[in-house]
Every structure is written in structure tokens, then in C-alpha cells.
Amino acid sequence: IGRLVGSEMCIRDRANIDPLGLRLKKEVPDLELGFHNLSENDLESSFSISNFQNSKELSLKDIISSLKKTYTASLGYEFMHIMDSRIRRWFLDKIEGKPTPYSFNSDEQEHILKRLVDSEGLEKFLASKYPGAKRFGLEGGESLVPLLDTLIEDFGSRGVKELVLGMSHRGRLNVLINVMGKKPSELFTEFAEDFEEDETKSGDVKYHLGFSSNILTSGGEVHLALGSNPSHLEIVNPVILGSVKARQDRRLDSAQDMVVPILMHGDASFSAQGVVMEILQLSQTRAYGVGGTVHIVVNNQIGFTTSLKEDARSTEYCTDVAKMIDAPIIHVNGDDPEASVMAAKLAVE
């Protein structure tokens, strides 16, 4: 019974992942006791469920309470569509039987808070200092910074040598400063009206520019490369994946575990731009596969001028297109930075 309830909650819209409260909670008859020929009189009955909390006997009330803590909090999981039962089992063992897949001590929480302050502080400064300038800020998506921090640290601790990032304009300036390590003074100079570009280089707007740096992690130094990006949304994806493939070949990385791509998307472009479907379809092929990609979709619930899901796509979630390659999908409430970091840790594992 508990496993059935858990499986249904995996794929239903019951997690608290909408910080704006715009999505209506759907009624799911499958999750009602009566649907399974049970009543409140059965809540004290005990059941032993294989691979759930070490198969110990629990009351139905405790089983449901545990599953609700897992599947109705700030993290939502979609993995029951995956054909490989080992992957499904890994997720179930990882997330069920405890309120959250990870817990943080006070030092870790303080670090997450500091990164949020860094992210929000930059946006507030740019908004007040350059009020009329285009900057495509990260307001509302500040959790992206500690999320990327976690990906870099956790991949580095596992021996990854290079991370190649691709993203569009939204939040790019924040990532350049707070993740990539670009000097704030360089960015502020680019905002200045009297800024003169280097005549030996072609000009471009500041939210298109790439950057590279080396970041020290617990596993050693990791090279970060953020690809330059035009205004054509998602077109950078195959460029980043091609760069990763070349770097793997150069390193003789046949296991494809030394260079990892991280692609960041907007909700509307991820579900609508054809190049996304192309890179997904080619991702498992021998010629073009790179061993896996971390896709991060920052969903601000408005695609350009389209705010209603019914006008933007035909699927329930913008990430549903990734199901065609059996990719696990983790939804997270952007107002919960700790949950965002947990999602990053799950992605690395």
C-alpha cells in the first residue's frame, strides 16, 4: 500500500513547488483511502513493506505520514517513467523513509545564506546603480547560485576536472560574478556609458559574454568554462556539448566522467525550442553522447509574454520533453534554497 501511494505521489502534482501559488492543486482520487478499499478504521492497521524503512512493520497512518513528508514538500520527483528498475529503486531508497534526502549543519546553512546574500545583493546594487540598463536579473531565482556552488563542489569531490556551462541571458551577470569569479569592477565598467571596448575584439552585450576560471574544491581544482551565448535561445546547447566531447577526447576520458556539461534553460524555451529535443535525442548515441548532462530549468512562470501554461505548451510541465530519454526529473521550489541544494546533490549522485 505504501509503495503504491509513493509511486502515485511521484508522478502527481502534490509537491509544494510553486512559490507563487498560481497552480491549482489537483484532486487525485488514487491517493484517497477509499480508492484502495480502505477507510479511517484501517489507519491503525500495521503493514510491513519491502525496502521501505528497512521493511519494519508500521501503521498505515505512519506510512502515509512518512510518504507525505517526502512527496508533498519543496521537492517533487518524477522517475517512475524510467524503464530501468535499478534507477527507480535507487530513487526510492534515496528519498523514502525520511523527510528530506539530505540534512545540513549550521555551517552549511550559513554558507547557503551567504551565497543568497551575494546573489541578491548584486541584483539590488545593479538595479539601483544602473536603473535603465538591461541586465536580465536573477530576482526570484537566487537559489541558482548555491545550487551551482553545490554542483561544482560535489563534482569536484568526485574527480571531475572540467565543468562546461551554457546558459541564456537570464541571471547570466549574477553567475559571472558569484559563480565564475569575474571581477565586479569589470562588470561595472561594462555598464558605464563611456565604456570603450578593446578595438582588437568584436563587441557584444555584457549578458552574452563567456568566461573561464579555476575553482578549488575538496577534490582539487576544477576548470569552469561558461560559453558565450547569442540572443538565440538554446542555440548554445550543441556548442557546449561539442566542447565537452572535444575535451573528453583530448583527455582520453573514455569513461566520460572527467568533463561534465551543465546547461541552464528558461521554462518556455526548454519545452518549445527544437534544438532541445535534438540534443536530448542524440544524448544517448555513441557518436554524440557525453556521459550525461545536468539540465537546470529556471521557471519564472512566464515565457516572454505568455503566462498561462495552456498557451505555452501541451504538457503538464515544461520538463516533460526530457521523459523521452528516461531522464529523471526533480522539481524544486525556488523559495527553498536548501531544497535547491538537495536537488543538486541528487543530480550529482
Where are each of the predicted segments found?
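Single conserved hydrophobic/aromatic residue that forms the stacking wall/gate
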Residues: 1-6
